[in-house]
Every structure is written in structure tokens, then in C-alpha cells.
Curated annotation (Swiss-Prot):
Natural source organism: Rattus norvegicus
Keyword S-adenosyl-L-methionine attached: no
Residues carrying a glycan: N82, N252, N278, N289
Record-annotated membrane-spanning stretches: 350-370
Protein name: Tumor necrosis factor receptor superfamily member 21
SMART domains: DEATH, Ephrin_rec_like, TNFR
Compartments, as annotated in UniProt: Cell membrane
Superkingdom of this protein's organism: Eukaryota
Membrane topology listed for this record: Single-pass type I membrane protein
Every Death domain range: 415-498
PTM section of the record: Oxidized in response to reactive oxygen species (ROS), leading to endocytosis.
Taxonomic lineage of the native organism: Eukaryota, Metazoa, Chordata, Craniata, Vertebrata
Biased amino acid composition, Polar residues: 241-262, 276-302
Topological domain spans for side Cytoplasmic: 371-655
């Protein structure tokens, strides 16, 4: 029994292990299938991403076909037809295409790079050849020039690139540059005080600070009582030289370690004076003034720098006992004496002077704004809108006749007021139109509502106030307001008044008016019959008979929905589209660029292949539209009307 139980347990464990292994294999196979599906999906995505199309005119049938573009690195070797797709071919050597295209020939690569330029990108099927200047040079006037080397005392302000030269700047105070370079910036002077040293020689724009050890804190060995120590940051070795003066009594020899661990700085000219000259031994009086009792002792420090210490004998004694002709002075104790007459540097004080000037300008602006606000408050509250309307009514009689006749259209000996025509048609919508034209407030609208009894009276008074309030009021603005509030019927009536082909009925032009201060003549109430209605009749002057209605661009806006009449100048020359209408469309298109391709697509069935080829050779879309106007305008009135309908359907802002 025990053996059978153990065997059953072993079989169960084996089955569990096999189940786990099987599950692991299934999971691995699923991951492998997912990875392969992603790999195979990538080229499909790439092929689906080629969504660009182009238009091609089949020369045999004359049809305009839409073909798929070829991918980058290829060109169209055969255009598509009704039964076949386009054929793409790889760009030959020396040519390339960067993007999807529908061209029949690849672009030629640029010429090989002239010396000393080097090639950054080679000529390939997808890229053009790109040439750059080698490192250390930049491109100037088509050639490579070396970067400028900043002289001593100047540092690099901006590093040079392949297209820009190095910019240098003079080292500011506290910095220096002792070597000419085209890459190094100005370095800061060594902080002697931070290293517990004294400044022996002040640095300039071309040299660094020279540091020395404080004599009060320096130490010497017992055998050499007078030692002056100097160091220079550019040398890794220094020499202990006996100075011409002895150190004060009481210096401890235990402080020598501090002397050895401190590195002082000395310029190269001072170091050359302190190094002994043992090359000439023949002349005892000329070359033995400075001697070394012992060879220089090399002492290695634990830091990265080490130095030699030269010990000079007292300069007052020679080797023979005679006095020396030259004496080397040791550095004095304490800090260097400051120059009482310091030079004024404008560059140092320029930042805070600029800030002070800006603050002064800001204060002046605030003071002026406060004074202006106080003057505005002293003027008192604004006048009541009703008083403004009364003044406007009084000024109406004083308005020049020329401004009043601007809104009157003379026809068959009758003067028809456009404002009265609009006021009789808009009804209660006059409030919205008036607010759109004048940006008027509710109080101003309420002033018209309380002063008149009928809507057409309020509308006429509001429109007259608009013409008085804004001298730039024009018929174009009025038409824009009517179209904004979907009153195209009123616009059609105005256009019919100005067109010679439409006759307005007398009952539509008769405006019922009640007597009011703003009415030029008493007119019966609306309840009176039609035969009692009258028109504003004004005999035109001889000059007004030859004057066009509205000198501005309002007339092309009114006539934009139809082609020119037979009496226009362009119609007599063979075009069915007026020059004013074409210029208005082209001017708007040039001011506000938009996609004109849908307009060209609508005209494809009207144009023949030769005309289509002429239009496609024009690079600019605006010039293409201009040429399209010229071609379509001489075909027929139906073709001209089709072009205008397409223009105003795709460019609604022109309406």
C-alpha cells in the first residue's frame, strides 16, 4: 500500500509539472505569434500610409484621373489609367525624391562638395547631398573660412559653428586670457586670499594674479634664517631662495611644513631673476654675484603639484666678500596697498544705471496715467442716451446734403432712400442689426424704443443715427449686417434696385411713416391704402446723374452673385465677368490665402486639355485663379456663372 501511494503521489507531481510546462509553452507561442503579427503588420501600415493622390489628364481620353502618389525615393514611370494603376520606379544614381510625389522624373542631386568642404549627407535616393565646412571653419560667402582666434586679453564669447564665426569679447574685470585661442573663454583670477596667500602682483586682462606667502605665517628651516617663497600656478616646481633680508627672530622651525604645503605664484620674469646663473665660471666678478651654496633640493609634496625651493644668499654679499650691484627685494608684509585713485569703469556701473532709467520711465508712465484718469473722472458721468438722440436729431438738419444723398439712389427721376427701404423690411430685427453695426448698449436701444411708436420708425431712426455716429458707415457694412442676421431677402431687394434687369414694385418701395422729427416729410400712417403712399422724390442734379452709387467696393459685393450684364465694358470686350468682380475676388484671396484646389476641380469638365496644361504651368494658386477667370470669362455666360458659384460656395467670406 505504501509503495502504491508513493507512486500515485509521484504521478500527480509529474502531471502538475507537465501542466506547468505546457502552459509555459502555450504562453510563449502566443507571444511569438503576436511578435510576428506586429512584424508583418509594419509593411502593411507603411503601404496604407501612402494616402497621397495627384491628378493626371489622360491624353488619349482627355479624362482627369486621380492616381496614387509614389513613395519617397521613387518616381512615376507610368501614370494610371481607367484599367491600370500607376507604376513607380526607383530613382537612378545621382537623383532623389524626399516625399511622396507624382512627378515623372527624380530631382538631380547637388554638385560634389568643393574643397575644403566635406560631405555630411551623401546623395541617395531619399536625400540630397549636403556639404559643410570641416571643424574649425565656418561657411562664409560660399566658401569655408577659419574661425577667428581671440587675441591675448580676449576670450570666446560664443563658440563658432559650421555656419557662424567665433565671437570674442574683452576679458572683464577679474578675468584674464594669456593665450590666443578660438575656443577658450576668459578665466577668473586666482583667489589668493582664499588660499591664505597675499597678492604680490595684481592680475590684468592678460595675466593672472601673483600670490605670495604672508611673512608673519611663513616658516623657515633653522639652517637658513632668511627665506622668501614664491610660487606660480603654471609651474609644478618651486625653489626656496635666501632673501636679502632675514626673517624676524622667533620664527619656529616647526612651521616649515606649512611653507612647503602652500603654493605661491610668481610671473616668469620674476622667476628668471631669482634663478642662479652658473653657466659662466671664468669671470668671478660678473657671474658670481648670485651663487648657490648647495644644489637645489627637490622636495616632493603629497599633492598633485611639487616644487623646488631655491635658497639665495643675501644679495648684499658676494662670494668674495664684495657688495652686490643688484639686490632682490623680498615681498613686504601685509596686504598690498590699494590705489587711492581708482579709475571709473562705465561698464561696471552700466547695469544698475539701466535699471534706474527703466524705473524712472515706469514712474513717469504711472504718473501720466493717474493724471489722465483724474481728468476723466472730473468730466462727470456720460450723457444720457436720450439726450444724445435729441442732439442727433437736431444735427440731422445741419448734415451736409452730400452725406445725406449718399444713401439715396436716383432712378427715373425718383430718389429712393436705401435706409427707408431697409427699415421697412427688417421689422423687429432692427435692434440686433443696430447693435451689430454700432456695438450699442441696451440703454441706447431702449432710447429708440421709447421715442417712436412703430418698428419701421425705430429702425429708420437707428440707421440714421448709425450714419451720423460713424462717418465710415458704408453700404458694405449694412449688407454684412443683413447677411449676418439672415436677411438675404433685403439684400436681394437692394441689389434689384441697383440692377437694371429688375424692377421694384411701387408697393414694396412705399414706406409707411408717421410724422416724427427724423422724417424728412410727413407720410400717412400704415393703415392708409397703397395709393396714398408716396415715394421720396428728389430731382437729381446734373452732376449726380453721372455719379456712380457708392464709390467704395459695395457694388461688387452686391453684384457678386451674378455675371455682368451686356452693357458692361468687359462684356463688350468678350468677357462675361466684370473686372471689378474679378479684382474683388483676387484681392480677398491674396489677403487671406486659402485652398483654391476645389475651385479648379469644379472647372475641370469645362476646360480642354490645352487650357488645363496652361493653368497647371502657373506656380502660384492666385495667378492660376486669375488665368482661370480670363479663360472661363470668354467661353459662355453659363460657364462664367458656374465659376462664380464655385468661388462663392468655397469662399463664403467673399459674400
Amino acid at each position: 500500500m505504501g509503495t502504491s501511494a508513493s507512486s500515485i503521489t509521484a504521478l500527480a507531481s509529474c502531471s502538475r509539472i507537465a501542466g506547468q510546462v505546457g502552459a509555459t509553452m502555450v504562453a510563449g507561442s502566443l507571444l511569438l505569434l503576436g511578435f510576428l503579427s506586429t512584424i508583418t503588420a509594419q509593411p502593411e501600415q507603411k503601404t496604407l500610409s501612402l494616402t497621397g493622390t495627384y491628378r493626371h489628364v489622360d491624353r488619349t481620353t482627355g479624362q482627369v484621373l486621380t492616381c496614387d502618389k509614389c513613395p519617397a525615393g521613387t518616381y512615376v514611370s507610368e501614370h494610371c489609367t481607367n484599367t491600370s494603376l500607376r507604376v513607380c520606379s526607383s530613382c537612378p544614381s545621382g537623383t532623389f525624391t524626399r516625399h511622396e510625389n507624382g512627378i515623372e522624373r527624380c530631382h538631380d542631386c547637388s554638385q560634389p562638395c568643393p574643397r575644403p568642404m566635406i560631405e555630411r549627407l551623401p546623395c541617395a535616393a531619399l536625400t540630397d547631398r549636403e556639404c559643410i565646412c570641416p571643424p574649425g571653419m565656418y561657411q562664409s560667402n560660399g566658401t569655408c573660412a577659419p574661425h577667428t582666434v581671440c587675441p591675448v586679453g580676449w576670450g570666446v564669447r560664443k563658440k563658432g559653428t559650421e555656419n557662424e564665426d567665433v565671437r570674442c569679447k574683452q576679458c572683464a574685470r577679474g578675468t584674464f586670457s594669456d593665450v590666443p585661442s578660438s575656443v577658450m573663454k576668459c578665466r577668473a583670477h586666482t583667489d589668493c586670499l582664499g588660499q591664505n596667500l597675499m597678492v604680490v602682483k595684481q592680475g590684468t586682462k592678460e595675466t593672472d594674479n601673483v600670490c605670495g606667502v604672508h611673512l608673519s605665517s611663513s616658516s623657515t628651516t633653522p639652517s637658513s634664517p632668511g627665506i622668501a617663497t614664491f610660487s606660480h600656478p603654471e609651474h609644478t616646481e618651486s625653489h626656496d631662495v635666501p632673501s636679502s633680508t632675514y626673517e624676524p627672530q622667533g620664527m619656529n622651525s616647526t612651521d616649515s611644513n606649512s611653507t612647503a604645503s602652500v603654493r605661491t605664484k610668481v610671473p616668469s620674469d620674476i622667476q628668471e631673476e631669482t634663478v642662479p646663473d652658473n653657466t659662466s665660471s671664468t669671470s668671478g666678478k660678473e657671474s658670481t654675484n648670485r651663487t648657490l651654496p648647495n644644489p637645489p633640493q627637490l622636495t616632493h609634496q603629497q599633492g598633485p603639484h611639487h616644487r623646488h625651493i631655491l635658497k639665495l644668499l643675501p644679495s648684499s654679499m658676494e662670494a668674495t666678500g664684495e657688495k652686490s650691484s643688484t639686490a632682490i627685494k623680498a615681498p613686504k608684509r601685509g596686504h598690498p596697498r590699494q590705489n587711492p585713485h581708482k579709475h571709473f569703469d562705465i561698464n561696471e556701473h552700466l547695469p544698475w544705471m539701466i535699471v534706474l532709467f527703466l524705473l524712472l520711465v515706469l514712474v513717469l508712465i504711472v504718473v501720466c496715467s493717474i493724471r489722465k484718469s483724474s481728468r476723466t473722472l472730473k468730466k462727470g458721468p456720460r450723457q444720457d442716451p436720450s439726450a444724445i438722440m435729441e442732439k442727433a436729431g437736431l444735427k440731422k438738419s445741419l448734415t451736409p446734403t452730400q452725406n445725406r444723398e449718399k444713401w439715396i439712389y436716383y432712378r427715373n427721376g425718383h430718389g429712393i432712400d436705401i435706409l427707408k427701404l431697409v427699415a421697412a423690411q427688417v421689422g423687429s430685427q432692427w435692434k440686433d442689426i443696430y447693435q451689430f453695426l454700432c456695438n450699442a448698449s441696451e440703454r441706447e436701444v431702449a432710447a429708440f424704443s421709447n421715442g417712436y411708436t412703430a418698428d419701421h420708425e425705430r429702425a429708420y431712426a437707428a440707421l440714421q443715427h448709425w450714419t451720423i455716429r460713424g462717418p465710415e458707415a458704408s453700404l458694405a457694412q449694412l449688407i454684412s449686417a443683413l447677411r449676418q442676421h439672415r436677411r438675404n431677402d433685403v439684400v436681394e431687394k437692394i441689389r434689384g434696385l441697383m440692377e437694371d434687369t429688375t424692377q421694384l414694385e411701387t408697393d414694396k418701395l412705399a414706406l409707411p411713416m408717421s410724422p416724427s422729427p427724423l422724417s424728412p416729410s410727413p407720410i400717412p400712417s400704415p393703415n392708409v391704402k397703397l395709393e396714398n403712399s408716396t415715394l421720396l422724390t428728389v430731382e437729381p442734379s446734373p452732376l449726380d446723374k453721372n455719379k456712380g452709387f457708392f464709390v467704395d467696393e459695395s457694388e461688387p459685393l452686391l453684384r457678386c452673385d451674378s455675371t455682368s450684364s451686356g452693357s458692361s465694358a468687359l462684356s463688350r470686350n468678350g468677357s462675361f465677368i466684370t473686372k471689378e468682380k474679378k479684382d474683388t475676388v483676387l484681392r480677398q484671396v491674396r489677403l487671406d490665402p486659402c485652398d483654391l484646389q476645389p475651385i479648379f476641380d469644379d472647372m475641370l469638365h469645362i476646360l480642354n486639355p490645352e487650357e488645363l496644361r496652361v493653368i497647371e504651368e502657373i506656380p502660384q494658386a492666385e495667378d492660376k485663379l486669375d488665368r482661370l477667370f480670363e479663360i472661363i470669362g470668354v467661353k459662355s455666360q453659363e460657364a462664367s456663372q458656374t465659376l462664380l458659384d464655385s468661388v462663392y460656395s468655397h469662399l463664403p467670406d467673399l459674400l
